[in-house]
Regions:
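Short acidic/histidine- and often glycine-rich active-site loop of Leloir-type glycosyltransferases
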Residues: 169, 181-196
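Conserved active-site histidine-acidic residue motif and adjacent donor-binding/catalytic loop
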Residues: 124, 134-149, 160-163
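A short, well-ordered alpha-helix in the C-terminal region of glycosyltransferases
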Residues: 217-226
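Acidic anion/phosphate-binding donor-loop and adjacent secondary structure
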Residues: 21-27, 63-83, 147
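Conserved acidic donor-binding segment of nucleotide-sugar-dependent glycosyltransferases
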Residues: 191-202, 210-215
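Acidic donor-binding loop of glycosyltransferase active sites
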Residues: 150-162, 175-176
Length: 226
């Protein structure tokens, strides 16, 4: 809003990292955020989904940049044991990351596979009652994240808004990203290099169990992700 009133400039740009109206309930704050897309700025967006939204829904002139990862940290390694293990990007303080949905999905998967191990990272979840065995890493360094991905057969990363950097990092570490379906994801991930799931705990659990039962399918996706 300040930039809209600032006129001593040749051009005005808007760095759009996510669809910020989705950060709020559909009320005043949602409208305030959405209105910023109608102020005539030129958009620079994180990824193609946001570029298309800005162009098609708001008439904004917009260009995008693609995602990447730090190849000095996220490197392909082989999992060193046969223990079934999954990673979940757990962010209960960030509603758009679907913490509750992911927890329900993993709980259902654990019921089907009682020997499953789960690694949480993204936030400290020690105050939550979690019925299955898990490691609570909390907020960690990129190197700890990379080491965690390598240990896991699959990494569950759910998002209701723009895709995070995690799927690329997971693939770079020779693990398999399990991502929620939608145009906000499929501009970068697809059913060749990732596992795409609905926003349904039972469907997520069934899908992940199926890949555990068919490791050759999982290996194919892992290879294409690299």
């Amino acid at each position: 809003y300040y930039v809209r009133r600032f006129n001593n400039t040749i051009s005005k740009f808007y760095f759009v990292q996510d669809f910020e109206p989705y950060f709020y309930a559909h009320g005043s704050e949602y409208e305030f955020a959405e209105n910023t897309y109608k102020m005539g700025f030129r958009g620079i967006t994180a990824g193609d989904w946001l570029k298309d939204v800005m162009r098609n829904d708001y008439g904004m002139t917009a260009d995008s940049f693609l995602f990447s990862y730090d190849d000095k940290i996220y490197k392909p390694k082989e999992k060193t044991d046969d223990k079934p293990r999954v990673f979940f990007y757990a962010r209960p303080v960030t509603p758009r990351r679907d913490f509750e949905l992911g927890m329900l999905a993993i709980n259902e998967l654990w019921k089907k596979m009682p020997d499953l191990e789960v690694i949480f990272a993204g936030w400290d979840v020690s105050n939550y009652e979690i019925p299955f065995p898990h490691q609570n890493l909390g907020t960690v360094t990129p190197q700890v994240l990379a080491d965690s991905y390598v240990k896991c057969d699959m990494c569950l990363i759910i998002s209701n808004t723009n895709l995070s950097l995690l799927p690329l990092e997971v693939m770079a570490c020779n693990s398999v990203a399990v991502c929620s379906k939608g145009e906000n994801s499929t501009w970068l991930v697809n059913e060749e290099n990732s596992i795409l799931v609905d926003y349904d705990p039972n469907q997520i659990a069934d899908t992940m169990e199926d890949y555990f039962k068919h490791p050759e399918k999982l290996a194919s996706i892992r290879k294409k992700g690299l």
